[in-house]
Amino acid sequence: MEEFQGYLELDKSRQHDFLYPLIFQEYIYALAHDHGLNRSILLENVCYDNKSSSLIVKRLIXRMYQQNHLIISVNDSNQNPFLGHNKNLYSQMISEGFAVIVEIPFSLRSVSSLEGKEIXQSHNLXSIHSIFPFLEDKFLHLNYVSDILIPHPIHLEILVQTLRYWVKDASSLHLFLFFFYEYYXWNSLIXPXKSISXFSXXXXXXXXXXXXXXXXXXXXXXXFFRNQSSYLRSTSSGALLERIYFYGKIKHLVEVFVNDFQAILWLFKDPFMHYVRYQGKSILASKGTPLLMNKWKYYLVNFWQCHFYVWSQPGRIYINQLSNHSFDFLGYLSSVGLNPSVVRSQMLENSFIIDNAIKKFDIIVPIIPLIGSLAKAKFCNVLGHPISKPARADSSDSDIIDRFVRICRNLSHYHSGSSKKKSLYRIKYILRLSCARTLARKHKSTVRAFLKRLGSGLLEEFLTEEEQVLSLIFPKASSTSRRLYRGRIWYFDIISINDLANHE
């Protein structure tokens, strides 16, 4: 986002922070294309992997400059000369580029919100893995947890109203509405419906950016609820219809309760409430009682109904004890267990046996859903037996090996924080043997004969960077390297959840 910020600062006097001119910049489409490749590294069909080029981008921008081609109706889109034979390609490129542009206000606002605050290495907070050290630190002291799915679909008009609070550029808002109203029948943009599924995997990037705006607004309101939880018991849900009046009413209520009801505020205060969200799933945890958790649950349900006009069933939001419940979040299965230990104490002639139980935050990889994701991607069957990939048999040997190795390292990198690495060893075995079966099928040979001819080279390709570094540092002390590799490792360069790990 530094490139975007630099562009806005250079043209601030001329463009007044307008986002609309960015749609005519070539580097926007290059960045959108790179982001698309990074997101779809595990997918078989990349949207325009081999079709997008600087020549096509220049042709697209030139046609947008020459005529007012952005005013196109759906009925004549097949005959429109601007789209021509590249209708789906152009629409995909425009929507992907516009999705990158829509993300600019959120990025700049998040950076500005961190300025002036003493947050060490705030750029690391962008990593998904930064959530898990927070969970390890906080959840050991909490009692109850609730898995919450943010309800959807949200109507398009509600998304646009939410987006107005973030994007002040009227031209960009009109362009956003144009995409969803004029091109709603194009599969490359969104599904043909007036209300979109905010967290559907088939939604386009522009729809996902708008849905992220709605989820960010919900998360901001949840943080506001957390800070003002003492006073919300008397707040009417009707005040949530307009946030300006809502803030005004809350401010008035604060003055009233501070002056008149100071003695009873502690009954409703919950200083140990924690909220974590990624995409459409959130985790709410508390050290308080089930009564307080139920109060929060109904606050959120009423908020969704009154502010986003979406229906959520309170009975489907479960409150569980952390001590006997595991929750699935971001491709990991997390739980708080007890690690028993026995201490023998000697005092004069008497000895005592003391049983201690220390809480431990355990994070493992759910192997069954992950194998299901691999089976859906045709790397194995539903039982976890590796199979060949006939769709990749036309590629060269180096391309086939490189693709399997990248997928394996990607999964190992993402799941490096697992307490138990045996599940990862099984995933590596599936991918390695699936790669061998694919190569053997291409060369019309058996797997045994192909592996014998290839030797240990294929195994070395599937080693992760961590294993390679540890083998260099401890070439002879294999037990030491294995012990270090079994430890949890969190990385600060993971900005999106792995596609195969996203089995929620």
From Swiss-Prot:
Cite a GO CC annotation.
chloroplast
Instruction: List the InterPro entries hit by this protein, alphabetically.
Output: Domain_X, Maturase_MatK, Maturase_MatK_N
Q: Which GO terms describe its biological process?
A: mRNA processing; RNA splicing; tRNA processing
Q: Which UniProt keywords apply?
A: Chloroplast, mRNA processing, Plastid, RNA-binding, tRNA processing
Under Pfam families, the record lists: Intron_maturas2 (PF01348), MatK_N (PF01824)
Q: Where in the cell is it found?
A: Plastid, Chloroplast
| Family note | Belongs to the intron maturase 2 family. MatK subfamily.
**Biological role stated in the UniProt entry:** Usually encoded in the trnK tRNA gene intron. Probably assists in splicing its own and other chloroplast group II introns.
* Protein name (database record): Maturase K
> Which species is this record about?
Hamamelis mollis (Chinese witch hazel)
Q: What is the lineage of its organism?
A: Eukaryota, Viridiplantae, Streptophyta, Embryophyta, Tracheophyta
Q: Give the gene that encodes this protein.
A: matK
